[in-house]
Amino acid sequence: YKFAKKVEKSGLGACNALSRDICVADKTYQENVCKFLVDTTKEFDISYWKLDGFSYRPCTNSKHHHMVGGENDMYYYSEMWQGWIDIFKSVRQARAEEGKDLWINMTCYVHPSPWWLQYVNSIWLQNSSDIGFADNLEHQPQLEREITYRDGRYYHSLCTRAWQIPQRYLYNHEPIYGTEAKVHYTDEEFEKYLYFNACRGQALNELHLSYTMMNKTKWRILSKVVQWQKSNFDILRNAMLLGGNPEENNVYGYFSWNENGDGIIALRNPTDESAPLTLTLNRLMGCPENLKNVNRFNVYNEGAGENFDSYSYGDKIDLTLKPFEVKVLQFGKKDRRYDYLEAVDEFTISFKYSSNEENCAICENDDVKITVEDGCLKIKCDSAMLTSSGKITGGEHKITVVREKNKMVKLYMDHALDGSVYDAAAKGEIDTKMESDALEFSAVNKATSYEDIVALKRVLTKAVKRRKK
C-alpha cells in the first residue's frame, strides 16, 4: 500500500483504495510499465517475465485514467485487460525484432482460461498457496503431505471445476526446496518429489531452491530429472490427471502419450495402506489406438526389476502400490530414459556366493574387478568403487552387479538394492568378457536386476534357437 501511494504521489500511476495496492488499469501506470518492460527486456536480454498480482479488487475511482461501472465492474476489467494485452504484445515485439522468444507467466488474480494462451505462455493454478500440506492422514511424512496438497489442487481445478486448459500451461510453483518453506527431504524423497512433479506435465519449472539445503547428490538428482523431463516433453506435454482425489485418500496418477506410442504413466498411492489396481491401456488412459508391441521401462520404480513384456492397445497391467509409493513407467519401442545422456555400455554380472572365505577373487579383467575382502564384496567398475553394506560370508547370497546407461553402478544383494554409485568419468565402452568359478556366474550386456536374470536368459536362449533355425 505504501509503495502504491508513492507511485501515485510521483505521478507514475494511481493507488487502488479497495485492494490497497497499485491500480493496474490506470493508463499512466500502464504506459510506464510498458516502457519499463520493453526497455529492460532489450537492455538485459530478458527471456522470461513473471507478472504477479493483477487486480485483486476492481478500482471504482472515476478520477483514475480508466473506465468504471457496469455489471460486476465489467467496464473496469475490460479496459484493464485490453491495456495489458497491448503490453504483452509490445514486449513480445521487442524480442521478436531481435529474433528471440519470450515466456510470459501470468500469476495472481487471472482467470485460468485457454483464451489467454494467445498472449501468454503459462497461468498460475489460482486455487493454491505457494506451498501447502494436506491433512488427509495423521502421522504421514512431510513430503507426502506436500505432494497430496498440490495434486489435490490439481484435482479441484481439473476435475471438480473442470477447467478446460491443458496441464502444460499451468504454473504450480514446484519444485520448492528452500529454507523459508520449512521442508527437509532425504535424497531419496527429493528424487521422488521431483519425478512426480515432472509428470504433471507443466512446461515451466521455477527452481525455488536454497543452495544451502542442497548437497552433491541432490544437485545430480535435479540435473537428471530436469534433463529427463526436457528430453521427454513431447510426451509429458500431453499429461492428464486420472483417478480420485488424493486428499480423499484415492489412488491417482498422470498419464501422457504422444501419437508415436511413446507414453509415461506416473502412479501414486497417497495412503498408508497397500492399493492393488489394474491399468487398461486404452483411450481412457490416453493411449493411441494403434499402440502395438511397445516395451515398458522403469523411470522411478523402487526395488522393481525391468520388465521384458511387450504391450499393445487394450492390454491390462496389474500392480500393487505400497503405502505412499510412486511409480513412473515409460512405454515405447525405444528406451528414451537416457536420451539426454551420452549413454555408456550397460551390463549385468550375477552369481551366487556361499563360501566362508574372507578374501577371494570372483572375476577380473582390465575394466571390471569383483573380489571379497575381509568378508565384504568389493566392486571396481571402470573408475567406480562400491563395497557391500555388510559381510557376505556365512550363508548363500544372490549377487548382482549392474551398470546402467546413465553411468550408475548398482549392487543388488538377495533381490534388494544394497548400494549404488554414479561414475561421472565412466568410459563409454568397457570389457565384460570374463570367466569365474562362482556358482551360476553370468555376464550379459544388458542392465537388469537379479530377479530378472532367469527371464533374460530364457529370452536370450529363445533368440539363439530362432537364429539357428
Give residue spans per PLM region.
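C-terminal beta-strand-rich structural cap/linker in extracellular carbohydrate-active enzymes
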Residues: F308-D339, K465
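Flexible glycan-contacting loops in extracellular carbohydrate-active proteins
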Residues: V421-D452
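Active-site-proximal substrate-binding groove within the catalytic cores of carbohydrate-active enzymes
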Residues: W84-G303, K316-F331
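Localized edge beta-strand/strand-to-loop motifs within extracellular or lumenal beta-rich domains
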Residues: H397-K410
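Active-site groove signature of glycoside hydrolases
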Residues: V33-M67
